[in-house]
Amino acid sequence: MKIRASIRKICEKCRLIRRRGRIIVICSNPRHKQRQG
């Protein structure tokens, strides 16, 4: 999980979703997991 100020999709399988007021990226590739911090 990478914590970043600005997050974006890395590949076409990345999905931007909102959980508990935080924007996170989920993907089939575990290296692409991100959270806005």
From Swiss-Prot:
GO-annotated cellular components: chloroplast; ribonucleoprotein complex; ribosome
Signal peptide: none
PANTHER family from the UniProt entry: 50S RIBOSOMAL PROTEIN L36, CHLOROPLASTIC (PTHR42888), LARGE RIBOSOMAL SUBUNIT PROTEIN BL36C (PTHR42888:SF1)
Localization per Swiss-Prot or TrEMBL: Plastid, Chloroplast
UniProt-recorded Gene Ontology molecular function terms: structural constituent of ribosome
Keyword set includes Chloroplast: yes
UniProt-listed HAMAP family: Ribosomal_bL36
Major localization class: plastid
Keyword Nucleotide-binding among record annotations: no
Protein name, per record: Large ribosomal subunit protein bL36c
Naturally occurring in which organism (per UniProt): Nicotiana tomentosiformis (Tobacco)
Name of the gene: rpl36
Pfam families (UniProt xref): Ribosomal_L36
